[in-house]
Amino acid sequence: RYRGTREVFLADGDPPQVGEVLRQPDLARTLELIARDGADGFYRGEVGQALHASVAEEGGRWTAGELAGYEVREREPIEFEYRGWHVVTAPPPSSGGVALAQMLQILGGWDLAAMEEPDRIHLVVEAMRRAYRDRTIYLGDPDFVDMPLALLTDPAYAAGLRATIHPDRATPSDLLSGQPVPLEDDETTHFSIIDGDGNRVSATQTVNLLYGSGLVAPGTGVLLNNEMDDFALKPGTPNAFGVMGFEANAVEPGKRMLSSMTPSIIESDDKVAILGAPGGSRIITEVLLGILGYDAGLDAQQVAALPRIHHQWMPDAISAEPDALAPQTVEKLRAMGHAVNAGEDTWGNLQTV
């Protein structure tokens, strides 16, 4: 559909084959301009003008002035404790850190390792359900939304949520209140790095869906995202990942959309691990399961290979990778009242070291 995209990915009319070298000289030049001129090399000048021109040609609504006025925000991370681990993770407008804090602090009240698999999975799913409910209701861009972050990440609040979980019965999602309490991949990439001096990086970047918007601005090599789908375009209507959205994540000029990115670093007295993943709304639960794996004594390879399960409040069902759950576990979970959907495809792509 888009000339610039065809020139990069369909140079001879066909997509590149495995083993073929994909050369992107326009993107290389754009990166050189950024290296030389910093932010001005991207948001302003010839690259910014080319981005705006290609978007305008296709009927897009943002202006060159809006792109030039974009600024990066640096925010304090979410930090909390879990069973001897100090966890550092992403703050809003990523929802990942708040949801991760809630889930781990709920689960920290139980000895999961001592439980049979169905009982352990049940509790993990119920923690996911409650965290994603709060994600939907409260979280958004902190420049626009007054969020009760101190409450949502408070161990006492997690204890209150834990008390609402029945040990052997699922909580129907539609019975969890959808009203706020009073205030107090698939085209995502993650890399986790530790160097010889102990410097650590956990970084996630995304264009949202496969190939983002599909538009490469001619002459730049830049593939533009379709992150607008991460906004709640209509309260109560799910996005492409099935995630519900409320007013806190509604579209507003200059607002950053809520994401699920969860780059995290965890440290104990003698260990450190870095985690993150692609996967849309499943990112948060992938990182959760990874941290639970490290806490259970697994190494990085074992953690990365863990089968994945996921629950996001709505739709009210457990998603599972093929063979992630034993048949007897599925049977018991269904007896507890859980809907279980075992898919045909894997989605786990946790990057950890």
Q: Where do the language-model regions lie?
A:
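Extended C-terminal subregions enriched in glycine
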Residues: K255, V287, D295-D345
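Short, well-structured alpha-helical segments that form the helix of a local strand-helix-strand
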Residues: A50-H52, E116-R129, A300-H310
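Glycine-rich phosphate/pyrophosphate-binding beta-alpha loops
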Residues: V88-G97, S192, T204-L215, A277-I284
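Alpha-helical support elements that line or immediately flank enzyme active sites
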Residues: D37-R44, Q49, S54-V55, Q105-I106, ...
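Active-site rim segments in enzyme catalytic domains, especially the processed small/beta chain
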Residues: R61-T63, N199-S268, L289, A296, ...
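Short, small/polar residue-rich loop motifs at catalytic or cofactor-binding pockets
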Residues: E74, D185-T188, L210, S259-M261
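Internal maturation/activation junctions in enzymes
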Residues: G13, W110-V207, V216-T220, P235-G236, ...
